[in-house]
Amino acid sequence: MRMDEFYTKVYDAVCEIPYGKVSTYGEIARYVGMPSYARQVGQAMKHLHPETHVPWHRVINSRGTISKRDISAGEQRQKDRLEEEGVEIYQTSLGEYKLNLPEYMWKP
């Protein structure tokens, strides 16, 4: 599968995540038939245009935390968008934003 095809499948899958729910990079990779491509799902999210309709903020890591970015404002933006959807997020002692993954997890 070419990467542009992979990205399209990833974006389509992410658009299926319901409001107020999240999924993980690995779960999206499995859903699109590329189970070892979790990091590439992250890259697909990174390449989205800022004004995209794809709900990128609903994809988190498998530990239930918002992944660190080069620009910390992105983490805050993801946290804010999830909280707007009713997802409860707390900050760990390490400064990570975390949520109760079993409560909010969406699996296709």
From Swiss-Prot:
SUPFAM superfamilies: Methylated DNA-protein cysteine methyltransferase, C-terminal domain
Signal peptide range: none
CDD domains reported in the protein's UniProt record: ATase
GO annotation, cellular component aspect: cytosol; nucleus
Residues under site feature: Arg finger, required for nucleotide flipping: 39
Any matching Pfam family: DNA_binding_1
Critical for recognition of O(6)-alkylguanines, probes the electrostatic potential of the flipped base to distinguish between O(6)-alkylguanine and guanine, annotated site positions: 69
DNA repair among keywords: yes
GO biological process: global genome nucleotide-excision repair; transcription-coupled nucleotide-excision repair
Site features described as Required for phosphate rotation/nucleotide flipping, chain residue numbers: 25
Keyword terms, alphabetized: DNA damage, DNA repair, DNA-binding
Record's keyword annotation contains Zinc: no
GO molecular function, one term: catalytic activity
Function recorded in the entry: Involved in DNA damage recognition. Binds DNA containing O(6)-methylguanine and larger O(6)-alkylguanine adducts. The DNA is bent, the damaged base is rotated out of the DNA duplex into a hydrophobic binding pocket (nucleotide flipping), with Arg-39 donating a hydrogen bond to the orphaned cytosine to stabilize the extrahelical DNA conformation. This structural change in DNA presents the lesion to the nucleotide excision repair (NER) pathway. The affinity for O(6)-alkylguanine adducts increases with the size of the alkyl group.
Something else known: Does not have alkyltransferase activity. A tryptophan residue replaces the cysteine at the known active site of MGMT.
Similarity field: Belongs to the MGMT family. ATL subfamily.
Protein name as annotated: Alkyltransferase-like protein 1
Organism: Schizosaccharomyces pombe (strain 972 / ATCC 24843) (Fission yeast)
Lineage summary: Eukaryota, Fungi, Dikarya, Ascomycota, Taphrinomycotina
